[in-house]
Amino acid sequence: MTKTLPEDFIFGGATAAYQAEGATNTDGKGRVAWDTYLEENYWYTAEPASDFYDRYPVDLELSEKFGVNGIRISIAWSRIFPNGYGEVNPKGVEYYHKLFAECHKRHVEPFVTLHHFDTPEVLHKDGDFLNRKTIDYFVDYAEYCFKEFPEVKYWTTFNEIGPIGDGQYLVGKFPPGIKYDFEKVFQSHHNMMVAHARAVKLFKDGGYKGEIGVVHALPTKYPFDPSNPEDVRAAELEDIIHNKFILDATYLGKYSRETMEGVQHILSVNGGKLNITDEDYAILDAAKDLNDFLGINYYMSDWMRGYDGESEITHNATGDKGGSKYQLKGVGQREFDVDVPRTDWDWMIYPQGLYDQIMRVVKDYPNYHKIYITENGLGYKDEFIESEKTVHDDARIDYVRQHLNVIADAIIDGANVKGYFIWSLMDVFSWSNGYEKRYGLFYVDFETQERYPKKSAYWYKELAETKEIK
């Protein structure tokens, strides 16, 4: 039976400033930590990425043509405040006004994120969000944007607080490249959630028009053997690190007893102490019912086994399937040998995990109000067919179809899901994979910056027109 999606459903495409804009030092933009980190550690940089800074009219014209009626955009904090605070860069402000005007001209609603992995370098060097001064600077930046850009109706504070702490302090693949420091992971999560809560409260108290929420990456965690208590415990602890800790902060305004028990266990095994003040709890509590929506980024699920050794993570950055290892002291290890398809980057393709995660939010956090799936898509080594000027990305179509089907199921089962944003609108730069891993509806020739609609773009157009998942 063909499933359908609601008439008012957003069929969106997602981007991020650093991954799409290029122009990393153009028109007064300040440096971000990634600029230096990529120069020192990788064979690629974010220059020119997809040159969205100059080519956004092309991408938005394509969006309109192919039925994309929403776009996730992030503002580069360092384009507005090159140092993260202090002097405003007027050319950066002008750019975003022009970008948002073009969105509305093309009938593509902008959903705008304030922070997408790109803290200005000056603040990042000073501890990023581990330094509580950065919370203050972020809230000031948020307030400036709320006042300056009234044309924006949908705001999100942060993109993926979980993977920021994870990437910076656990896996070590984001600057500053620290590994296995659980104290920093949880402190980063917490401090960023305080920053989120303060910005949301400010938005509501200021009477700004529009809606505000946050985007969380929520990979579902399962025990490899549900009858083995060690595997069950490993899945619970891994879920606390990546999901439950930040969801509790968002919607409970505190951390549940089970969450804190898990955090204390992990810190007791690995060393470290979490600094949470009474004022922090008051801030979280004041904002817990004020989020207008939750953005869920979902790509994969993980299966966990009990584990009794030291932490060791091998990150698959090359797309050579089977190159991943992930085991954490006091937590557990991910089992990759499961009967589930996976991508070349060892990401488990499991649409049921998205359904389970949506329904978990509905059940455990009934004050969620509404959900957008703000990222979901398939990273692929796309093969461009020169004679046809396209990509036959049937695997991507199949991936998206499967995930939209479970979204339709979740809606039937009572979840208020209002839209879906494919990652990504066009091919963009990938943080730890460079330019090989492509996700877009539109193929980008990174040499010429020409755009070519893939087969998936035509499929998505029909989906947006008919609302039928075929």
UniProtKB/Swiss-Prot annotation:
Sequence intervals crossing the membrane: none
MF term (GO), any: beta-glucosidase activity
EC number: 3.2.1.85
Reaction(s) this enzyme catalyzes, per UniProt: a 6-phospho-beta-D-galactoside + H2O = D-galactose 6-phosphate + an alcohol
Class of the enzyme per the UniProt entry, highest EC level: hydrolase
InterPro entries in the record: 6P-beta-galactosidase, Glyco_hydro_1, Glyco_hydro_1_AS, Glyco_hydro_1_N_CS, Glycoside_hydrolase_SF
Binding positions (D-galactose 6-phosphate): Q19, H116, N159, E160, N297, S430, W431, K437, Y439
Keywords per UniProt: Glycosidase, Hydrolase
Biological process terms in GO annotation: lactose catabolic process via tagatose-6-phosphate
Pathway connected to this protein: Carbohydrate metabolism; lactose degradation; D-galactose 6-phosphate and beta-D-glucose from lactose 6-phosphate: step 1/1
Entry's Gene Ontology cellular component terms: cytosol
Similarity remark: Belongs to the glycosyl hydrolase 1 family.
Entries under PANTHER family matching the protein: GLYCOSYL HYDROLASE, LP05116P
HAMAP family named among the record's database cross-references: LacG (MF_01574)
This protein's name: 6-phospho-beta-galactosidase
